[in-house]
């Protein structure tokens, strides 16, 4: 009958315990293997009888090339394998003394050794758990060590492997000398450590020793003995190897910086900056995003505009010299744009999505991240601080400027119900790869608030300075890295200003970096105007007018110059582009593509122009029109019209185009022609159609009474007032300018401040009395371009009807926030009952402006300690066509304050001293 493993070996335990002294006498016979008969007689069984390990032993014997019961004994405990905990509780085995067995079979003696003299372990194998051949084969199939060690592994896999408990490993270590083979460092799935084979020939042992000595020279230093007993120990060397293999390959990965400096130490603000030697990447490599982040850090630390421009310019010089293809992504990252305005790409990532991505990327709790964001007021700082808590075994490659910009565009293109989850996945991937301050600026860019004070004009100035000092198109190494070297400070400044004007004028006509940058890199700055010219299909920033308080001011401004007065229509600016191939595009004041909003206008273009007209750009105002009454409708009616993908058959609100300027005609730019010439060409090449396309009503006169009557008539005709423009002198079309050569004279201007203001709603106060249960007042703010802040300017509570108050309450309650946005500044203003997400823009009129110690708007621009506030503000309307960044700026508020008659009388200044501003 088949016996268990324990009963198979148990009868011999006493016999072995009584003969320990005869172990030494058998040392003379260690060189010869014992006869098989003696082994069988000692076992008391025949090899073909009831041994429970006979078959596995024979199968292994064919592999090992040895015979007899010796192999059976070596493999027999595999069937009776026990947990390591049980083995650790077994008392040390007694030494065997059987005279029939030689030293190679008696592994329990403290002096036991192999035929070659290698010390043997002293534990009784019959009580040790052993693996089956199947387990060994499975481990062999999972072995993924490098090819250099494969020969050694094949030798080791021929030997049966045994498990050691912690106590046994410690005991074995005490008896081993320095030459004894140690556990190989290859990773295993189990905790079983390999031990020397007990029955091998002397040549085999010698060969094995040579292989082990070879490995000793190549493998890393031996770990502490205590780690050998850990259940997970075999995995640790594998992890270490993976890290070591990753390190040498990491710098070679795409986008990794191998320049003379590590990106973390990059400093574009240093004096005497060298675009090649001080860069942190090599020629042809992608610009590390960390270099961009370090540049933003340096810009954030200073407030002087010239210093900010110089710092950004130094980065751009390195990009031009080393990685020209990355110039466009770096510029867009600096502007926090995703492309030209007409592409309509916006990130649309709210703070909630950002915080969720931060939490998932760093393993933090979402509530903890939200609490920190509320405390710090800056999602960027929260992302940066959270990043330091994350540890990765295999860190992703370093971020590159082009890679980050590409991810931003991917996020902007996502639409649909699952877009939020996809956005979070992309953002999470960016955060995981962030180093140092990268997370701060990625989070800020995604939120749409980079908070650097880098306006568009500053970025253009930095670009012109970069390509002037370090001209593009040079062979590497560039022969000229500082073209201004040798010039005096004054001459250098004048030269850079002249170069900057070239780029500025070109950008006004072609406000599309996608077109400008390739030409700039190929032909240089001085030849840029030759290759980038105004053309249909690329929207322009329109020319705007300055406000004026009365007719007398108009006459004083223009003096002897001829001028014209036109109706100022209350609608939306529409820039009509007709391309050579017949395609028509319509753009808004903000260069947004509104072509899909006005299919009715596009359909009427062929009949409003003469056949000789092949291409043009018209400046017009789209106004709501009542076809039955044949009159202009209020602006609010126009805002009810659908904005996107409008079906012409479903249009409820009809529009009429009022054309007042012609900018481009049949391949020729007209921006440098006087208004009189542009107006003549407009009327000669286009045909009026009532209710569809009409020229702006105008009057050419210098008579004050006629102008006053014309103003009153414009109001009766549902217009806002008049636009007064010079006809011949200084009468060019000034793109992107708020020019003093165009003055707006509204009916409201005759009493009061001279202009309305477009302000952002940042808070709401709960109403009382008849306004109880809804908002009764609102906190408004102007926009500061330099600090990118919204600065509180007044509390508004008048000008609303009951219906309007209810509408505002319903629309604004969805914008309620637990705390103000970090870029909202209120100083001493009364804290509102509800903070609002600053997205709504309202047009407001006031009696005048006054200095205020409470409100921070324009503080420091007129008075060093006081801001400016509105007296008796009154709500006019909602400006749905404006974003918060397009609201009245603090600089404009200061300008309006200075232009008040009583202030001018005190200062003895003329309003003409105000500089014309590019917006």
UniProtKB/Swiss-Prot annotation:
<dbReference type="GO" id="GO:0006284">
    <property type="term" value="P:base-excision repair"/>
</dbReference>
<dbReference type="Pfam" id="PF04679">
    <property type="entry name" value="DNA_ligase_A_C"/>
</dbReference>
<feature type="modified residue" description="Phosphothreonine">
    <location>
        <position position="233"/>
    </location>
</feature>
<feature type="region of interest" description="Interaction with target DNA">
    <location>
        <begin position="642"/>
        <end position="644"/>
    </location>
</feature>
<dbReference type="InterPro" id="IPR012309">
    <property type="entry name" value="DNA_ligase_ATP-dep_C"/>
</dbReference>
<feature type="compositionally biased region" description="Acidic residues">
    <location>
        <begin position="136"/>
        <end position="145"/>
    </location>
</feature>
<feature type="region of interest" description="Disordered">
    <location>
        <begin position="1"/>
        <end position="270"/>
    </location>
</feature>
<dbReference type="InterPro" id="IPR050191">
    <property type="entry name" value="ATP-dep_DNA_ligase"/>
</dbReference>
<feature type="modified residue" description="Phosphoserine">
    <location>
        <position position="801"/>
    </location>
</feature>
<dbReference type="GO" id="GO:0003910">
    <property type="term" value="F:DNA ligase (ATP) activity"/>
</dbReference>
<feature type="site" description="Interaction with target DNA">
    <location>
        <position position="590"/>
    </location>
</feature>
<dbReference type="GO" id="GO:0006287">
    <property type="term" value="P:base-excision repair, gap-filling"/>
</dbReference>
<dbReference type="GO" id="GO:0005634">
    <property type="term" value="C:nucleus"/>
</dbReference>
<feature type="compositionally biased region" description="Polar residues">
    <location>
        <begin position="98"/>
        <end position="116"/>
    </location>
</feature>
<feature type="site" description="Interaction with target DNA">
    <location>
        <position position="305"/>
    </location>
</feature>
<keyword id="KW-0131">Cell cycle</keyword>
<dbReference type="GO" id="GO:0003909">
    <property type="term" value="F:DNA ligase activity"/>
</dbReference>
<dbReference type="GO" id="GO:0005524">
    <property type="term" value="F:ATP binding"/>
</dbReference>
<dbReference type="InterPro" id="IPR012340">
    <property type="entry name" value="NA-bd_OB-fold"/>
</dbReference>
<feature type="modified residue" description="Phosphoserine">
    <location>
        <position position="66"/>
    </location>
</feature>
<keyword id="KW-0235">DNA replication</keyword>
<dbReference type="InterPro" id="IPR016059">
    <property type="entry name" value="DNA_ligase_ATP-dep_CS"/>
</dbReference>
<feature type="modified residue" description="Phosphoserine">
    <location>
        <position position="51"/>
    </location>
</feature>
<feature type="modified residue" description="Phosphothreonine">
    <location>
        <position position="195"/>
    </location>
</feature>
<feature type="modified residue" description="Phosphoserine">
    <location>
        <position position="819"/>
    </location>
</feature>
<comment type="subunit">
    <text>Interacts with PCNA. Interacts with POLB.</text>
</comment>
<feature type="binding site">
    <location>
        <position position="573"/>
    </location>
    <ligand>
        <name>ATP</name>
    </ligand>
</feature>
<dbReference type="GO" id="GO:0071897">
    <property type="term" value="P:DNA biosynthetic process"/>
</dbReference>
<keyword id="KW-0007">Acetylation</keyword>
<feature type="modified residue" description="Phosphoserine">
    <location>
        <position position="49"/>
    </location>
</feature>
<keyword id="KW-0436">Ligase</keyword>
<keyword id="KW-0132">Cell division</keyword>
<feature type="modified residue" description="Phosphoserine">
    <location>
        <position position="913"/>
    </location>
</feature>
<comment type="function">
    <text>DNA ligase that seals nicks in double-stranded during DNA repair. Also involved in DNA replication and DNA recombination.</text>
</comment>
<feature type="binding site">
    <location>
        <position position="744"/>
    </location>
    <ligand>
        <name>ATP</name>
    </ligand>
</feature>
<keyword id="KW-0225">Disease variant</keyword>
<dbReference type="InterPro" id="IPR000977">
    <property type="entry name" value="DNA_ligase_ATP-dep"/>
</dbReference>
<feature type="modified residue" description="Phosphothreonine">
    <location>
        <position position="798"/>
    </location>
</feature>
<feature type="active site" description="N6-AMP-lysine intermediate">
    <location>
        <position position="568"/>
    </location>
</feature>
<dbReference type="GO" id="GO:1903461">
    <property type="term" value="P:Okazaki fragment processing involved in mitotic DNA replication"/>
</dbReference>
<feature type="binding site">
    <location>
        <position position="621"/>
    </location>
    <ligand>
        <name>Mg(2+) 1</name>
    </ligand>
</feature>
<dbReference type="GO" id="GO:0009653">
    <property type="term" value="P:anatomical structure morphogenesis"/>
</dbReference>
């Amino acid at each position: 009958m088949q016996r268990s493993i324990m009963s198979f070996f148990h009868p011999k335990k006493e016999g072995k315990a009584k003969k320990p002294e005869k172990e030494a006498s058998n040392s003379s016979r260690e060189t010869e293997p014992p006869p098989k008969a003696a082994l069988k007689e000692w076992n008391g069984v025949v090899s073909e009888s009831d041994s429970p390990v006979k078959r596995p032993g024979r199968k292994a014997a064919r592999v090992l090339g040895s015979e007899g019961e010796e192999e059976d004994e070596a493999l027999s405990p595999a069937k009776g394998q026990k947990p390591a905990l049980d083995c650790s509780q077994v008392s040390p085995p007694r030494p065997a003394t059987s005279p029939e067995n030689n030293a190679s079979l008696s592994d329990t003696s403290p002096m036991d050794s192999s035929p070659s003299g290698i010390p043997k372990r002293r534990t009784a194998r019959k009580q040790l758990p052993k693996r089956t051949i199947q387990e060994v084969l499975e481990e062999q199939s999972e072995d993924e060590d490098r090819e250099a060690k494969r020969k050694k592994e094949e030798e080791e896999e021929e030997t049966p492997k045994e498990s050691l408990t912690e106590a046994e490993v410690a005991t074995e270590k005490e008896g081993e000398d320095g030459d004894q083979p140690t556990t190989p460092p290859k990773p295993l799935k189990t905790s079983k450590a390999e031990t020397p084979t007990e029955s091998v020939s002397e040549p085999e042992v010698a060969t094995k020793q040579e292989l082990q000595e070879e490995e000793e020279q190549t493998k890393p230093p031996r770990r502490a003995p205590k780690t050998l007993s850990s259940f997970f120990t075999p995995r640790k060397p594998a992890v270490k190897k993976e890290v070591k293999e990753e390190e040498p390959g990491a710098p070679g990965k795409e986008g990794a910086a191998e320049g003379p400096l590590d990106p973390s130490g990059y400093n574009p603000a240093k004096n005497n900056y060298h675009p090649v030697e001080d860069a942190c990447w090599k020629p042809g490599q992608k610009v590390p995003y960390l270099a961009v982040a370090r540049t933003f850090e340096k810009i954030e630390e200073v407030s002087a505009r010239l210093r900010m421009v110089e710092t950004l310019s130094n980065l751009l010089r390195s990009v031009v010299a080393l990685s020209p293809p990355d110039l466009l992504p770096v510029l867009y990252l600096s502007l926090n744009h995703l492309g030209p305005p007409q592409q309509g790409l916006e990130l649309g990532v709210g703070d909630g999505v950002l915080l969720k991505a931060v939490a998932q990327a760093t393993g933090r709790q979402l509530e903890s991240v939200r609490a920190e964001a509320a405390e710090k007021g800056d999602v960027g700082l929260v992302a940066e601080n959270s990043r330091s808590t994350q540890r990765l075994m295999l860190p992703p490659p370093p971020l590159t400027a082009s890679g980050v910009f590409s991810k931003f565009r991917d996020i902007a293109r996502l639409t649909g119900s699952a877009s939020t989850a996809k956005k979070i996945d992309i953002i999470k991937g960016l955060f995981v790869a962030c180093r140092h301050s990268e997370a701060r600026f990625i989070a800020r860019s995604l939120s749409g608030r980079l908070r650097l004070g880098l306006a568009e004009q500053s970025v253009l100035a930095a670009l012109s300075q970069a390509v002037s000092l370090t001209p593009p198109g040079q062979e590497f190494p560039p022969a000229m890295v500082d073209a201004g070297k040798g010039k005096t400070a004054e001459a250098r400044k004048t030269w850079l200003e002249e170069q900057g004007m070239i780029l500025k004028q070109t950008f006004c006509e072609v406000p599309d970096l996608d077109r400008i940058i390739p030409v700039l890199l190929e032909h240089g700055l001085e030849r840029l105007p030759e290759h980038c010219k105004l053309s249909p299909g690329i929207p322009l920033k329109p020319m705007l007018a300055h406000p004026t308080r009365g007719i007398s001011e108009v006459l004083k401004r223009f003096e002897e110059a001829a001028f014209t007065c036109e109706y100022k229509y209350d609608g939306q600016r529409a820039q009509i582009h007709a391309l050579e191939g017949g395609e028509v595009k319509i753009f808004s004041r903000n260069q947004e593509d509104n072509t899909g909003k006005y299919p009715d206008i596009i359909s009427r273009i062929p009949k409003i122009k003469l056949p000789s007209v092949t291409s043009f750009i018209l400046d017009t105002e789209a106004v709501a029109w009542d076809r039955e009454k044949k009159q202009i409708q209020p602006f609010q009616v126009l805002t009810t019209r659908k904005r996107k993908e409008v079906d012409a058959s479903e249009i409820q609100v009809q529009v009429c185009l009022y054309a007042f300027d012609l900018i481009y005609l049949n391949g020729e730019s007209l921006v440098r022609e006087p208004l009189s010439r542009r107006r003549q060409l407009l009327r000669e090449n286009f045909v009026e159609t009532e209710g569809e396309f009409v020229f702006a009503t105008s009057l050419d006169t210098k008579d004050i009474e006629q102008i006053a009557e014309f103003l009153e008539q414009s109001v009766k005709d549902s217009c806002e007032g008049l636009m007064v423009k010079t006809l011949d002198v200084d009468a060019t079309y000034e793109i992107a300018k708020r020019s003093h050569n165009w003055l707006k004279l509204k009916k409201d201007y005759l009493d009061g401040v001279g202009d309305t203001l477009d302000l952002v709603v940042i808070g709401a106060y709960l109403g009382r009395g008849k306004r109880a249960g809804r908002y009764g007042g609102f906190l408004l703010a102007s926009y500061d371009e330099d600090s990118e802040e919204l600065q509180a300017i007044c509390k508004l509570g008048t000008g609303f009807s009951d219906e309007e108050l209810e509408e505002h309450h319903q629309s604004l309650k969805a914008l309620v926030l637990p705390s103000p946005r970090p870029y909202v500044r209120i100083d001493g203003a009364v804290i509102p009952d509800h903070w609002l997400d600053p997205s709504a823009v309202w047009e407001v009129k006031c009696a005048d402006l006054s200095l205020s110690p409470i409100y921070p708007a324009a503080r420091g621009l007129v008075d060093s300690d006081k801001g400016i506030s509105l007296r008796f503000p009154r709500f006019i309307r909602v400006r749905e066509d404006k974003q918060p960044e397009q609201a009245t700026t603090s600089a404009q508020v200061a300008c309006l304050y200075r232009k008040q008659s009583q202030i001018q009388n005190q200062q003895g200044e003329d309003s003409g001293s105000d500089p014309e501003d590019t917006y």
